[in-house]
Regions:
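FAD-site-proximal beta/loop scaffold in flavoenzymes
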Residues: 56-72, 152-203
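Rossmann-like dinucleotide-binding cores of NAD(P)H-dependent redox enzymes
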Residues: 67-68, 73-77, 83-142
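Flavin (primarily FAD) cofactor-binding/catalytic cores of flavoenzymes
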Residues: 14, 134-138, 170, 191
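Glycine/serine-rich phosphate-binding loop and adjoining beta1-alpha1 elements at the start
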Residues: 7-11, 17-20, 29-59
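Glycine/Thr-rich phosphate-binding loops of Rossmann-like dinucleotide-binding domains
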Residues: 48-50, 87, 92, 166-169
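Conserved beta-strand-loop-beta-strand element in the redox core of flavoprotein oxidoreductases
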Residues: 18-32, 141-151, 157
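N-terminal Rossmann-like dinucleotide/flavin-binding domain of flavoprotein oxidoreductases
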Residues: 1-32, 111-135
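Short hydrophobic core segments
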Residues: 14, 32-43, 78-79, 99, ...
Length: 203
């Protein structure tokens, strides 16, 4: 439906070739396209922390793998006590899965009002959820998680430490202002580059 006189859809992997204040050049395959403005909507990817034993470990899940699973794990360790991590922790706990949350910060949900967090933390722990704060993961050995406060084991380990903007193909825009893994925009979705805009999970 997008293919009409106002919009042309081109399937393929695109990359930015060059940018000036007057135009942006994009390459898709062997063809280049030029426009006055660029809107970046490349989304984001799960961030995989450089923790020894995480990469290529079949026990490790990200949020996409957790949602795609057809079976409940026997037990779950969730690395990261942010919003997404605690959403999964609550979900699995309600489904009867023993859950341990490991958060490196002094508290879970660090971006929320701390009075609310205190109430939630008490509720989670009273319900039987194990929540470890101020605890850093140092290594993963199969199903075992080694931390600064001991070792923990579960059938699966869900790594939920945030997402990062998908910047593949945007290397030519090295001057883009970034913050916490996303492109910085104003209320009009403008970046710090005159003719470059961004929207969605990439911000």
């Amino acid at each position: 439906k997008l293919n009409n006189e106002h919009c042309t859809v081109i399937m393929g992997a695109a990359s930015v070739v060059s940018r000036t204040d007057e135009n942006v050049v994009i390459a898709c395959g062997d063809v280049q396209y030029e426009a006055e403005n660029l809107l970046i909507c490349t989304g984001s990817n799960n961030f995989v922390p450089p923790i020894p034993g995480v990469k290529d470990n079949p026990a490790i899940w990200d949020s996409t793998m957790a949602l795609d699973s057809k079976e409940l794990p026997q037990s779950m360790i969730i690395v990261g006590g942010g919003v997404i991590g605690m959403e999964f922790a609550t979900l699995y706990h309600e489904l009867g899965v023993p859950v341990t949350v490991i958060e490196a910060m002094p508290t879970i949900l660090p971006n929320l009002d701390q009075e609310v967090v205190t109430i939630l933390l008490e509720k989670y722990r009273k319900a039987g959820m194990q929540i470890l704060t101020d605890t850093k993961v140092t290594e993963v050995q199969g199903n075992k998680v080694l931390t600064t406060n001991g070792e923990y084991e579960a059938e699966h380990i869900l790594v939920s430490v945030g997402r990062r903007a998908n910047m593949q193909g945007l290397e030519a825009l090295s001057d883009l202002e970034m913050y916490r893994g996303g492109i910085v925009v104003d209320e009009m979705m403008r970046t710090n580059l005159k003719n470059v805009y961004a929207a969605g999970d990439v911000t």
